[in-house]
């Protein structure tokens, strides 16, 4: 199934929805860290990009990436369960990866819950490699699997 949605930079009016989606989709069972103030901080940060995916006017996905000197870090990527496996996550990730390459950054890193096998399969399917495990990464409760992708291939292929 192909995503029929628009990806765009998040607006101030999206902050609450992004924070809520993070709490439901990513931070379930944890003390919420991605409160509206933190999302807004990343929206204002010149080294971060906050994207949303909309199905007409409804927010169906979001992603937050922070760019550093030699790499980028995918902080969050979430898609509403009813729209998962429809290409929205790939669409958001493609936008961010293209932005990274355009900015001269060719390495993207992320962490995902060790128990989140669906997310691990998704990231592997788009070229991410597992590079290690961080015990207790999620507030001492859950381990994280570190993953990364070298984007040099995107530069070489032109996208």
Task: Annotate each language-model stretch with its function.
Residues 79, 113-114:
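Short amphipathic helical patch at the helix-1/turn junction of helix-turn-helix
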């Amino acid at each position: 199934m192909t995503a029929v949605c628009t990806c765009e930079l998040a607006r101030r009016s999206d902050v609450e929805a992004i924070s809520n989606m993070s709490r439901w989709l990513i931070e379930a069972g944890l003390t919420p860290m991605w409160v509206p103030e933190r999302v807004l901080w990343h929206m204002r940060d010149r080294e971060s990009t906050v994207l949303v995916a909309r199905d007409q006017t409804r927010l169906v996905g979001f992603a937050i990436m922070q760019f550093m000197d030699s790499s980028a870090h995918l902080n969050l990527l979430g898609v509403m369960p009813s729209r998962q496996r429809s290409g929205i996550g790939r669409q958001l990730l493609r936008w961010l990866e293209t932005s990274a390459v355009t900015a001269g950054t060719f390495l993207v890193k992320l962490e995902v819950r060790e128990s989140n096998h669906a997310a691990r399969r998704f990231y592997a399917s788009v070229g991410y490699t597992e590079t290690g495990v961080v015990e207790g990464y999620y507030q001492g409760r859950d381990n994280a699997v570190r993953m990364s992708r070298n984007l040099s291939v995107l530069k070489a292929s032109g996208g």
